[in-house]
Amino acid sequence: AYIPSLRRVRRISVEVKSDSLLGTDHTLEDFYGFNGRPMEHDWEYVGSTNILVVAKSRYRETVYYGPNGWAVKDDYTMRQTDVVKQIPKKSAHPYAYKFIHIDRVTGESYYANAFDKAGELWKVWQLTKVWSEDPWVVLDGKGSDFGWKEKGQFSPKGTNFQLFQSINVIDLQNNRGTLVPCRGTEAPNQNLKRAKR
């Protein structure tokens, strides 16, 4: 990542995946709920629960409000999620454990809650979503192009999938948050010739 104040590119080693990412409350491992090496953790299925999530935002961009500006102002819907507990095997990991809520239908993560070594809630992630076929999900003004466009071909009509709209983390112990209003721009590749084993 290029850091303008240093006029340098900072390379991010995969070995520091549980360290703070560029001064934010995120780590490399935290993106999308979990973005690490599964074998470096023990996993437990906790159960299923219904939670309120932003599964289909009504806005083009994430709208924040509230006393700290951390809450997402949008349409919330009830979704059934499976909850898994992630327990790091390495004692030097900053979290004692983390719960990840995964949508039963789409497989998308909406929330994650990390706890410190004392068992106190430390960080909460919220991932808001949009759908690929929403009218405002357009990158070039001419039509959606989410990486599936290959040689002028778009994904078959009716291919509808979720994209993240924001990745937000609230550090409850330090009373701060990192809000990342962004949009996922990649989609499953529909070209079977490019599929690798």
Residue ranges and their predicted role:
Residues 181-197:
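Long, C-terminal catalytic modules of enzymes
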Residues 33-75, 80-82:
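C-terminal amphipathic alpha-helical segment
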